[in-house]
């Protein structure tokens, strides 16, 4: 069953997708790499490495259409209902280069700057898959690089995060407020950990 469908029966009601297990394991390695490279400027090559690390061993790695370790080859979108359109594949290399050059040129300390950067990365959606995970991880990295409290989007706040991305052009406060709330939550966790 693992070979034919890429799944394992967890119990009578559910399947475990092998690629999900691999990506979860790979995510830990990718996170360690990000922590080791906090002070490194973002480049296309850095993003390619993250994408390759996350997709290592998955079916996508063997599928040339997925272009693991490279930019997307086919159009994609964010979400399925009320989908947000993303940058066309031919425009991605220039869009990413421009975004990263502008970002790396100046220090950032305002959460709005980080929200704008994250929104722009997500709307470029440079990879065939896992753009959200990579985008949120580089947001974490760049907050650390700026000596600011990082954040993790909790599952319970994912709808607010997605709303923030969808409405960002009209009202950036949804995304900024969601990121700020997650930053506050992470601050509380760190403070509790330091008390132990």
Set out the residue ranges of the language-model regions.
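FIC/Doc superfamily catalytic core
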Residues: 1-129, 133-196
């Amino acid at each position: 069953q693992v070979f034919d469908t890429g799944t394992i029966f967890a119990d009578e009601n559910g399947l475990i997708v092998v690629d999900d297990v691999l990506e979860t394991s790979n995510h830990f390695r990718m996170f360690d790499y990000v922590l080791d490279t906090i002070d490194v400027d973002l480049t296309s090559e850095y993003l390619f490495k993250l994408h390759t690390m996350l997709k290592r061993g998955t079916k996508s790695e063997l599928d040339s259409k997925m272009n693991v370790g490279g930019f997307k080859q086919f159009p994609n979108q964010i979400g399925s209902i009320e989908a947000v359109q993303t940058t066309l594949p031919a425009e991605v290399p220039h869009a990413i280069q421009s975004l990263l050059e502008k970002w790396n040129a100046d220090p950032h300390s305002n959460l709005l700057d980080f929200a704008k950067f994250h929104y722009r990365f997500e709307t470029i959606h440079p990879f065939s898959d896992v753009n959200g995970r990579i985008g949120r991880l580089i947001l974490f990295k760049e907050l650390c690089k700026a000596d600011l409290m990082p954040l993790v989007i909790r599952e319970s706040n994912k709808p607010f995060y997605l709303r923030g991305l969808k409405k960002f052009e009209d009202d950036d406060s949804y995304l900024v407020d969601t990121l700020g709330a997650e930053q506050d939550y992470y601050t509380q966790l760190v403070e509790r950990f330091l008390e132990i």
